[in-house]
């Protein structure tokens, strides 16, 4: 991982209202959407793993809205872990025994090299018994979508096909960043699958 995820990084991209990528309002809307779709698909939501939990916006949302959900948050940043209360773990090297109904991995994968991405997906799949929400900016996103004044562009720029290939073996795409672990108990209509 090329980036130092220190206080300066978090101030620049997440804590400053003037320069942050996302704030509470955006993550609240995203969390409602993700959990709403899981409810629509009939999935249980008892345990959540948040990989690269950063400033803890998902953690805060679950605490306010679904406080009975068992929530576990990880980050590689010593700063984020101390300030926001996460476990310090690297998903490319760590695989826990617990299984989760939802694994969240938002904005993490582009920091890994290719082998790190492969290990991260394998580890998340092993711990997922339901859904994965994955957000990873792609080379096209970097060219055409992101606000470069607010987005850390010091990442591995990869085509979407790279992530789709990695996920295909272990997850079924459902659209909007949501996937379901292969071999799970859910069946989806053709047009629900991404």
List each language-model region with its residue ranges:
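Class I (Rossmann-like) S-adenosyl-L-methionine-dependent methyltransferase catalytic domain
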Residues: 1-98, 112-119, 123-194
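A conserved beta-strand element that flanks and buttresses the S-adenosyl-L-methionine
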Residues: 104
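Hydrophobic adenine-recognition pocket in adenosine-nucleotide-binding enzymes
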Residues: 108
């Amino acid at each position: 991982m090329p980036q130092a995820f220190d206080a300066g990084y978090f101030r620049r991209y997440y804590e400053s209202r003037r320069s942050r990528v996302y704030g509470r309002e955006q993550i609240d809307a995203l969390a409602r959407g993700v959990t709403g779709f899981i409810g629509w698909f009939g999935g249980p939501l008892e345990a959540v793993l948040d990989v690269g939990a950063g400033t803890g916006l998902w953690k805060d949302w679950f605490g306010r809205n679904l406080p009975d959900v068992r929530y576990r948050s990880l980050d590689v940043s010593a700063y984020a872990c101390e300030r926001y209360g996460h476990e310090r773990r690297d998903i490319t090297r760590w695989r826990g025994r617990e299984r989760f109904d939802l694994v969240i991995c938002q904005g993490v994968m582009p920091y890994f090299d290719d082998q790190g991405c492969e290990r991260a997906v394998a580890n998340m799949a092993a711990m997922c018994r339901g859904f994965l929400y994955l957000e990873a900016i792609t080379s096209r996103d970097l060219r055409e979508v992101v606000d470069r004044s607010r987005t850390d562009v010091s990442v591995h720029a990869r085509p979407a096909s790279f992530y789709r290939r990695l996920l295909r073996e272990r997850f079924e795409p459902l659209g909007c960043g949501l996937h379901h672990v292969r071999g799970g108990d859910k069946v989806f209509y053709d047009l629900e699958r991404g």
